[in-house]
Amino acid sequence: MKRWKAIWLVIIVALFCIAAQAQNQGQSVDAILDDSFRSMYNLQFDQALSKAEQAKQVDKTDPMPWVAQASAILFREFDRLHILRSDLFASDDAFSSRPAYSWVPASRKQFDDAIAGGEKIAQDRLNRDKKDVKALFALALFNGLRADDAALITKRNLTALSYTKSSTGYADKLLAIAPDYYDAYIATGMGKYLIGGKPAPVRWMLGTTPGFSEWKCEPLSSCHLRPPGPQ
């Protein structure tokens, strides 16, 4: 059961890495995405979606704005359903007894459309270049988003595990090409923990105020997460 409590971390952790990466790169699309993810973590979903749409217009061949869009829609639904309240993850019993929820139909369609649109862009990129790391990373994240939906909203545990395996598969392909693409280790490490039940050094604090404690994944000491803001 502990692995099911961890499944939601796959995409949430990876998305925070994207925000930090965007700030460091300083590129136009990435800078806009940085604003989008920060707005999302601050529960400013309209602003997050507006920034994601802006990034889509800057580069229509980049799947990452679609990741940001789908993420904001999913987090908005989490917030509406109070899914990320801390007591849900306080114990195995609390998590296993969680109910299955229903999406707002319009939001469900927005989420599915965002993922479908982004996956098409990513697959088109892979058709041109099988080693396109951005496409592989986006596909890993899209499957992670689907896993979070299945695990935390609709409570389809086996479906969530299937999406997690797919996410890990794309991340493994990426790392075979670019072993220094550290963000992808999050998906593989968490995925292998969920599938194999091996211990994972995960620390997470999630309360009423959006934010994160420092998170480190081994064996890569270079993979860190810190709260938003200047360091």
Question: What is the predicted function of each stretch?
Answer:
Residues 24-35, 39-51, 61, 72-131, ...:
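Short coil/linker segments at helix-helix boundaries
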Residues 8-17:
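Bacterial N-terminal signal peptides
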Residues 1-8:
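Bacterial N-terminal signal peptides that target proteins for export
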Residues 18-22:
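Sec/Tat signal peptide C-region and signal peptidase I cleavage site
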Residues 64:
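Acidic donor-binding loop at a coil-to-helix junction in glycosyltransferase catalytic cores
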